[in-house]
Structures are given as structure tokens and as C-alpha cells.
Amino acid sequence: MTSHKLSGMKKIVIIGGIVIALLLIGYFWGFYTPKRYNGIDVSHHNMVDWTEIDRNSDLEFCYVKATEGKSFKDKKCVEHSRNAKKIGLNVGLYHYFRTDVPAKSQFDNFKSVYRAAYSNMIPAIDVEEQGNDFTDAFAIPRLIELIGLFEKEFGCKPIIYVGSLSCVKFIPEFWDCPLWLRAVKSTNIIPNTAIKQAAIINNIDMNYSPNVRKLMLDK
């Protein structure tokens, strides 16, 4: 007579197999890494309760919007960066790239805010299709020039935030930079992925990195 109940050992083997399978699936689809470091990115649009974040989170890093285009300076940049530092987070600053503005003007704008704010992580350039015209003959050369200016100033290639994989496809220079991808199921097809933006919680973008130590500036 056979029993409809599995023995204890068989249960353990089956459950163990399911767990391993889920972990493998998660790994290949970008949902699991052996160790991941959680972070957020913020701008003046976000009302951030830093005391609450300090009390209830396991965050390791924070990226703060500094500038956009030629003249826009985020009014909360310095405050956000210093508050993030105060609660023990590593901090990076990012610039929102505009295709219709010369690279040098954008770099000078970013540098002026960078001096005033706190940062100990590699700076980032936010490259999004929304509001930008990448069919403009000057757009790609401007971005390439801006990447070069960042590299010369900070001694490393900037992180490139891309709103979609289509940006990566038509700008091959991205492959030489660490990438910050938004809501992409699998990071395995992009070898240089350094940060993944995975969710939005309470109007704040949540990110994670498999190795945040590699994103630190050498000072």
C-alpha cells in the first residue's frame, strides 16, 4: 500500500529543489544577486523624511539630481546630499542631459553645483528620450563630449542612466560606461550594468547595485 503523504526526507528534497529553481530563475532574470546594495534617487520633486529613512531602511547609497541642461540647478541638491550623508549614506550627483545644449555649458553647470554639494560616488548623466531629440545631428556628439569632460574632471567614466534599452542600442559609447538601467527585467544582456532602478515606493525611486564599492570615487 502506498501512502498519499510524502516522507519527511522527500518533502525536504522537493522543497529544496523548488527553492534552488526559483533562485536560479531569479538570478537569470535579474531579480536576485548574492548580495545587493539598496539605494534611492531623489530631486526637488521628492519630499524626503530623512529621519524616517534613517530609522527604517537598509539603504547604502543615494543619487541626487544636481543640474539639467545649461542653467537649471536643483534647489534641493545641496540639502538632499548633506542630509543623505548625515544618515550615513554614500552619495552621488547626477546631471540631466539636454540634446539642445552644448556639452561644455552643461558640464560647467554641473561642476558649479558639484562644488557646493556633498558627493563621494561616481557622478551620473541622466539620458532619456523624453524631451530630447536624438535625431539631431549634434545630439550624440554633445553627449560623447560631455562624457569625456566628466571623465577628465573626475578621473573615471560617468555612470549613464538610461530610460530605455533603445538609448543603449543607438549610442555604442555607453558600453564603455557603467550603466544605470530603469525597470529592466534582465540585466544579463547589458554587461556594464552598475545600478538597476527597480521600483517606486512612496514616490521615491528605489535602486540596487550588485557592488556599490565599485561606484565610489577615489579621493
Regions found by a protein language model. Name each.
Residues 2-21:
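N-terminal Sec-pathway targeting helices
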Residues 26-68:
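Boundary/entry segment of secreted carbohydrate-active catalytic domains
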Residues 34-44, 50-52, 172-219:
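Functionally critical loop-and-helix segments that line ligand-binding/catalytic clefts
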Residues 38-41, 60-65, 91-95, 121-127, ...:
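Structural recognition of the beta-strand scaffold that forms the well-ordered cores
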Residues 44-47, 67-72, 97-102, 129-133, ...:
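Solvent-exposed loop/turn segments at secondary-structure junctions
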Residues 46, 102-115, 132-149:
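Alpha-helical scaffold elements lining the catalytic groove of polysaccharide deacetylases
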Residues 49-58, 76-88, 110-119:
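Acidic (Asp/Glu)-rich catalytic clusters
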Residues 121-189:
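Catalytic domains of cell-wall/extracellular-matrix polysaccharide-remodeling enzymes
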